[in-house]
């Protein structure tokens, strides 16, 4: 009997499993209804729009490839791409999508593709990998544009659905993947999932 007890004690020591680390984070079971995904993002160039006429009349191409024609088109494109990515993320996490609505607070900006002259009054952009990553205001003739990194805080709210944080983490990871790979968004910070 003593040998059996010693063998059992040795097995416990050798194969010790910490229950809290084996079952995941203690917050994975937190229930979240109507979550808000908040992120820092350099938006896809298609979520911006170009001016109807160039700042310099002789400028042949004053827009970026894939850029929207106007603010309405840019906003509709952003809404559609955010909704599609989030719905795909919910499906990947085995969550129901019937009756779910997705809203965001994105507002498009007007950006012009810089050429040899960059007059004041215009906002010029730099696109990398399909995303608007920096902007510069126009300058007087002969001066060099000074670009600053461009990223915005974006909030995406998912309504009429609730799940545990475990499932929201799966949805978050899939959302990031879809936005990056399919729509060329660049994330510049962590995405947080919070309650309304």
Swiss-Prot record:
Taxonomy, superkingdom: Eukaryota
Descriptive protein name: Uncharacterized protein ZK675.4
Organism: Caenorhabditis elegans
